[in-house]
UniProtKB/Swiss-Prot annotation:
A zinc finger (unnamed) spans 3-34. PANTHER family: TRANSCRIPTIONAL REPRESSOR NRDR. Keywords: ATP-binding, DNA-binding, Metal-binding, Nucleotide-binding, Repressor, Transcription, Transcription regulation, Zinc, Zinc-finger. The keyword Manganese does not apply. This is Transcriptional repressor NrdR. Belongs to the NrdR family. GO terms for molecular function: ATP binding; DNA binding; zinc ion binding. The gene is nrdR. The lineage of its organism: Bacteria, Pseudomonadati, Pseudomonadota, Betaproteobacteria, Burkholderiales. Its cofactor is Zn(2+). Residues 49-139 form the ATP-cone domain. InterPro entries: ATP-cone_dom (IPR005144), NrdR-like_N (IPR055173), RNR_NrdR-like (IPR003796). Negatively regulates transcription of bacterial ribonucleotide reductase nrd genes and operons by binding to NrdR-boxes. The keyword Zinc applies.
Length: 159
């Protein structure tokens, strides 16, 4: 594989591991020319459904967009990159399991929200506020109240 830093053709695999969700192989590589290290991922290429946007246009499913959206919602939150990858893999699996050739963007957004709900409640609220286009504080309060009803009460944090 070509080095992303110096473009040299000769790189060696230093370490290989199966990802946490088992859907990819993570490889650490070292360039023999510049001695820099980098990570690559090997995963199965799947035929995921096309995404039908709200305006009716269609686009290919783009894993990177889902990862970027989740990373934005999870910005400065204590969630590992592997957990994000595992969540995206679960979304892809759910889409494949439907057997459909197309998925509405609204459905895809709901799948992302469900995964974020399990990863980090703050990220869930952030994503929901943009995805559902919250217009005032009461909508935030409604989502927070949903969490309070769904989870057992915790004692307040000491500051």
């Amino acid at each position: 594989m070509r080095c992303p830093f110096c473009r040299h053709e000769d790189t060696q695999v230093v370490d290989s591991r199966v990802s946490e969700d088992g859907a990819a192989i993570r490889r650490r590589r070292r360039c023999s020319a510049c001695d820099k290290r980098f990570t690559t991922y090997e995963r199965v290429e799947l035929n995921l459904p096309a995404v039908v946007k709200k305006d009716g246009s269609r686009t290919e499913f783009d894993r990177r967009k889902i990862v970027a959206s989740m990373q934005l919602a999870l910005r400065k939150r204590p969630v590992a990159a592997d957990a994000i990858d595992a969540a995206v893999a679960r979304i892809e699996y759910q889409l494949l399991a439907t057997g459909e050739r197309e998925v509405r963007s609204e459905k895809l957004g709901e799948l992302v929200m469900n995964e974020l709900r399990g990863l980090d409640t703050i990220a869930y609220v952030r994503f929901a506020s943009v995805y559902r286009r919250f217009e005032d504080v009461s909508e935030f309060a409604d989502v927070i109240e949903e969490f309070r009803r769904a989870s057992p009460s915790k004692p307040p944090r000491k500051r």
